[in-house]
Amino acid sequence: MATIAVAGTGYVGLVSGACLADFGNTVICVDNNQKKIDNLNKGMIPIYEPGLDDVVKRNVASGRLSFTVDMASAVRSSEVVFIAVGTPPADDGSADLRYVETVAREIARAMNGYKVVVDKSTVPIGTGKRVRAWIQDEL
């Protein structure tokens, strides 16, 4: 099984990370919100999804799921990195990709070898090329 980092612990990131861990992968969920990470480490789940509490608790107890604010360490420890951050609407209604860009650049600065980067955020067509360019800019 793989070691996977998931950037973002909202609905998409937390549910994806917990499910990937439940399949047997080692998953490190990362968020820049220290309080959210502290609460997750205490077993306090910030969202409601049927069955999520049990999946998180089971996988934390097994050592397959962990939570941190240390993006660099999570990226260095992983083969696959999921970007699952918010993409709120911009003033013109398009997706605001600033959080995706920030995370992509953070991933690049932490890379210690080949990584598969998966954009799980809700983004427009062509964002994958932009993520690749942002990563290459930092390498």
Which ranges hold each PLM region?
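N-terminal glycine-rich phosphate-binding loop for ADP-containing cofactors
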Residues: A7-T9, C19, N32, R64, ...
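A structured beta-alpha segment of the ubiquitous adenosine-cofactor-binding alpha/beta core
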Residues: L52-E79, P89, A108
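Short, well-ordered coil/turn residues at beta-beta hairpins
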Residues: S77, I83-V85, K120
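NAD(P)+-binding Rossmann beta1-loop-alpha1 motif at the extreme N-terminus of oxidoreductases
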Residues: M1-M44
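Short, hinge-like loop/turn segments at secondary-structure boundaries
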Residues: I45-Y48, A84, I135-D137
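Hydrophobic packing residues within well-ordered alpha-helices of enzyme cores
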Residues: L40, V56, V131-I135
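Rossmann-like NAD(P)(H) cofactor-binding subdomain of soluble oxidoreductases
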Residues: P89-L139
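Short, well-ordered alpha-helix to beta-strand connector turns
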Residues: G24, S77-S78, Y114
